[in-house]
A protein has these predicted regions:
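Conserved beta-strand hairpin/beta-sheet module of binuclear metal-dependent hydrolase folds
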Residues: 1-47, 51, 165-180
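Short, structured coil segments at secondary-structure junctions
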Residues: 3, 76-77, 215
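Residue-level marker for buried hydrophobic side chains located in beta-strands
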Residues: 27-29, 58, 81, 172-174, ...
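Active-site metal-binding motif and surrounding structural segment of the metallo-beta-lactamase
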Residues: 37-88
């Protein structure tokens, strides 16, 4: 579905994949779940495109719910997959995911939200995500020579190699899991710090400063609906959401 001019989304907001189109060519941002593979082909067809029109797959980070179909499109269509160097080993499956000890207490968990995410994972192939055999790298501050010309903003915390992609031409920023507008564990909506799956919550909080001053009217998270009230307001709300025990 088109959510802004030149930007389309796969998924219903639980786990997001974005397609960024420019002059008939496409950049994919994140690869969601393996089960999105058929959805990807359908969305490209709706655009009048095929996998041959995809120039690159960019990962905001290398957690399994963002790696999804990456190896399949790399292997079958030769699409290069790019990730920050600090997440390259994770993308290749050489190391496992790490979680910070600070997360929402059990009282804030939502059985309904957890059940919904578990059902999604089971029905979209999340139990069999294939590591990426070969990845390229993208560096902080680089403007990438791919459709949309996204600029890389390193935001370590959720993972060491987490990044955002700022696309001034679309007045948009893709923030990955630097923050969410839908929490798959608690069910919370709106911009907030989703602490459960962060590698280092304090580092994630510090990284928010790297978003200050970026001009973007639309914010596109890895989980949840697009936020159309601007990045500045989104970051303000995220800071307001920080748990007291992480403010010291």
């Amino acid at each position: 579905m088109e959510i802004a001019p030149g930007i389309r989304r796969l998924g219903a907001g639980l786990v997001n994949v974005y397609l960024l189109e420019e002059s008939g060519a496409v950049t994919i941002i994140d690869a969601g779940a393996p089960g999105y593979w058929k959805d990807l082909h359908a969305e490209l067809a709706a655009m009048g495109r095929t996998p041959d029109d995809v120039r690159a797959l960019l990962l905001t980070h290398a957690h399994s719910d963002h790696v999804g179909f990456a190896e399949q499109i790399r292997r079958e269509s030769g699409v290069p997959v790019l990730v920050h160097p600090d997440d390259a080993a994770l993308a290749r499956g050489e190391v496992g995911q790490v979680r910070d000890e600070h997360g929402p207490g059990y009282r804030s968990w939502s059985i309904r939200a957890i059940a919904g995410f578990a059902f999604f994972a089971l029905t979209h192939g999340m139990t069999r995500v294939t590591p990426i055999a070969e990845v390229g790298t993208l560096l902080d501050g680089a403007t990438l020579d791919v459709p949309g010309a996204p600029r890389v903003v390193h935001l370590p915390g959720h993972t060491s190699g987490s990044v955002a992609f700022h696309v001034p031409a679309r007045d948009a920023v893709f923030v990955g899991d630097a923050f969410a507008t839908r929490n798959v564990i608690t069910g919370r909506r709106g911009p907030h710090l989703a602490t459960t799956f962060n590698e280092d919550n304090r580092r994630a909080i510090a990284s928010l400063a790297r978003l200050d001053g970026l001009a973007a009217g639309i914010v596109l998270p890895g989980h949840g609906d697009a936020w159309s009230k601007g990045l500045e307001e989104a970051v303000r709300l995220v800071r307001d959401s920080i748990p007291d025990e992480l403010r010291a």
